[in-house]
Amino acid sequence: VPAREALLYRAMGPKRRKKSSEKLRRGRRPSEGLAFVARDAWGAVTGTVRLWDVVLGEGGPAALLLGPLAVDPTIKNAGIGSALMRHAIAEAARLGHAAILLVGDAPYYERFGFSAEKTGSLAMPGPYERHRLLALELVEGALAEARGTLRAAGRKLKAQRLPLAA
C-alpha cells in the first residue's frame, strides 16, 4: 500500500530498511489477518502496524514478529499507536497465536505486557540491542523452550513478472 509506505518513511526514515527486523520481513507477507492501518476522517493513513510469522530457532515454535508500529509524526500522542497495539494483540490472540516478539523501546511496550524476560535465549538475525528484544506470551509458557535465532516463516511475496521489451 503506497500510503502505508509513505507513512513509514515519514515516521521512521530510510534507515528502517537496514534493521534486523526488516531481514525477517523482506520478501514475506504479513501474517494472515494481521495488517492494520488507522485512518483519519478523510481516509488518510495515520498509523500502521503489521505482524509477521517467524519461527524461534531451528525447528522451534512459531510466533509473530510485530512491526513496525508507526504513527504520523504530526499527530503523535493522540493514542493511535496504543489503539493499534491493543487491536493487534487482541486479533493475534483471537487467531490462536501463542506469542508476539518485537524490537523496541521497553518503556513504551511494557504497558501492553511486553518484556525482555522471556527473550534471553533468543536472538535476531543481525545486529540489534539485546535489551530491546521484547516478548509477550499470549499463551502461558509459549516461550519456555524457545531458543535460537528468529527465522522468517509464512507466506512469501509473489515475484512480479515484468514484460520484456523487444
What are the language-model segments listed below?
Residues V1-K23, R29-P30, A35-V45, G59, ...:
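Short amphipathic alpha-helix that is part of the acyltransferase structural core
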Residues A35-R39, G43-V55, A62-A70:
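Conserved beta-strand in the GNAT
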Residues A44, E58-G59, D72-A83, L95, ...:
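Conserved glycine-rich acetyl-CoA-binding loop
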Residues L66, V71, N77-A90, L101-L102:
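Conserved acetyl-CoA-binding loop-helix of GNAT-fold acetyltransferases
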Residues R94-A98, V103-E129:
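Conserved active-site alpha-helix within GNAT-family acetyltransferase domains
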Residues A116-G148:
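A contiguous, mid-protein "functional segment" used to position or interact
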